[in-house]
Regions:
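Transmembrane helix boundary and interhelical loop/hinge segments in multi-pass membrane proteins
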Residues: 26-47
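A structural motif at transmembrane helix-loop-helix junctions in multipass membrane proteins
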Residues: 31-33, 92-141
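Extracellular/periplasmic helix-loop-helix junctions in multi-pass membrane proteins
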Residues: 128-135, 149-168
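Junction motif at the cytosolic side of a transmembrane helix
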Residues: 126, 172-192
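Long, hydrophobic alpha-helical segments
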Residues: 9-31
């Protein structure tokens, strides 16, 4: 019975909570990268570099994505280590994560990180501070909270099919958001 409860926690409850990590890490990095440089007046120096505005945009996006993914993977390893140690201590058995975790780590985490970065970049043109840019990306957490509530009430059950669908929708949304964010990344908007 205990092992079933641990399996439920690992494979059904933790994924919904886990999706918040890349949103938070990526949006903090993106806000610091875009708005933070304008606040510290280091953006002008960067714009004098031989890189094009498109290359600067891509580098900042990749930096935010890399930080989000590193934080996600380290958090996943720590969570798995702690949960496995507890399951082993209490039941004497090991617990394997479901295949859903593979979809989450390889498809949904990068997609949700890119969505957070795109929202942060779009809002950074209007934001006056890093905190203001970060606060706008918080709205991405609301659907995750709805997913958590759905999990606890039994309305939504996370499974591989739902995760694949969510991943495809997020990837399509990312393409649209990134196109819009790239369009708002101009010299005039950055310096104003």
């Amino acid at each position: 019975m205990q092992q079933m409860i641990f399996a439920l926690v690992l494979n059904n409850i933790m994924p919904a909570f886990f999706l918040m990590i890349p949103i938070m890490a990526s949006s903090v990095m993106a806000a610091s990268s875009f708005v933070g440089e304008r606040e510290k007046h280091s953006l002008e120096t960067l714009l004098y570099s031989p890189l094009s505005i498109k290359q600067l945009f891509q580098a900042k996006i990749l930096a935010g994505l890399a930080v989000g993914m590193i934080v996600s993977y380290v958090s996943f390893a720590a969570m798995l280590l702690v949960l496995e140690a507890e399951v082993l201590f209490l039941t004497g058995n090991m617990l394997l994560p479901s295949a859903s975790w593979l979809i989450i780590m390889l498809l949904i985490d990068p997609a949700i990180s890119l969505a957070a970065i795109a929202v942060t970049v779009r809002s950074s043109a209007k934001a006056q501070s890093v905190e203001e840019a970060q606060q706008r990306a918080v709205f991405l957490i609301f659907p995750i909270i709805a997913l958590v509530i759905g999990q606890f009430t039994g309305i939504i059950l996370i499974n591989s099919g739902l995760l694949w669908g969510l991943g495809v929708v997020l990837a399509a949304l990312d393409a649209l958001l990134m196109r819009g964010a790239a369009g708002s990344f101009t010299y005039e908007k950055l310096l104003s």
